[in-house]
Amino acid sequence: MKPSGITFAFLVVFMMAIMYNSVQAAAIADADADAEAKAFADAFAEAGWGSIFKTVGKMIAKAAVKAAPEAISAMASQNEK
């Protein structure tokens, strides 16, 4: 039995509705995540934790700069084998 054009049109519209809803849900989730991240950052700023994380970040960056040449040479030696 051959499906009619109306059946095909219904399926196309149904698929478009599903895709539209998934895109809308993703946009809402992104907006929620952005708002949550901003609220988290604001709470840290109000609590005075920003300077602590800035200091810790600098310490991590210094350690990474010191460790980078060793890590690069180790990876290069693994690639040569």
Swiss-Prot record:
Its main location: secreted. It comes from the Eukaryota. InterPro entries: Pilosulin (IPR049518). One of its GO terms (biological process) is killing of cells of another organism. Truncated sequences of this peptide have also been found in the venom. It is possible they have been cleaved in the venom. Residues 1-25 form the signal peptide. Expressed by the venom gland. Residues 26-47 form a propeptide. It is found in: Secreted. GO terms for cellular component: extracellular region. Keywords: Antibiotic, Antimicrobial, Cytolysis, Hemolysis, Secreted, Signal, Toxin. Pfam families: Pilosulin (PF17499). One of its GO terms (molecular function) is toxin activity. Belongs to the formicidae venom precursor-01 superfamily. Cationic amphipathic alpha-helical peptide with antimicrobial activities against E.coli (MIC=6.2 uM), S.aureus (MIC=6.2 uM), and S.cerevisiae (MIC=50 uM). Also shows histamine-releasing activity (30.1% at 10 uM) and a weak hemolytic activity (10.4% at 50 uM). This is U-poneritoxin(01)-Om2a. It comes from Odontomachus monticola (Trap-jaw ant).
